[in-house]
Amino acid sequence: MKQKLQALDRAIKRFNDFPTPGILFYDITPIFLNSELFEFVLEQMAQFIQEVKADGIVCPEARGFIFGGALASKTKLPLVLVRKPHKLSGELARETYDLEYRQNSILEMRVDALENCKRCVIVDDLLATAGTVAAIDKLIARLGSQTVGYCFLIELQKLHGKAKLQPNVATKILLHY
């Protein structure tokens, strides 16, 4: 496991001042070019999803969709998409939140998306300030379901996002920076 995590770390490229000055961007796209590394990530996440007995996978766009779609197929669980405004049709629930480098962002989810998902795991590539996750938590609760797990490839520890997650909800993070 340690060797795989080291290989994951080596695969991730770092870019200073992207997308804005002062931000260190972790580019995970090289992982998708290596099927062995990507499969390792999916196996770790799928095992966690089974451990928390989730019955649905909730993920935000865009990179969350990459993991969420693959995990939904692997675990045979429904995939619930959380998107930016005006990307989903139907009746929507929306939540405002702040990002590390942008304020007053909005996420939307179809109000019928969780009808068969009462125990949700939130999957995304990165945990930074936890603004996105907190907004998704609120949407899940508002629609009558609960978050039973958080699953991320990377945590940016200096932003203290993990401290803002629900304290009694299991968390899986593969890499910590």
Curated annotation (Swiss-Prot):
Q: Where in the cell is it found?
A: Cytoplasm
One GO process term, biological-process aspect: AMP salvage
Q: Does the keyword Mitochondrion apply?
A: no
Single GO MF annotation = AMP binding
The annotated subunit structure for this chain is: Homodimer.
The UniProt entry's sequence similarity note says:
Belongs to the purine/pyrimidine phosphoribosyltransferase family.
The protein's name is: Adenine phosphoribosyltransferase
Gene name in the database record: apt
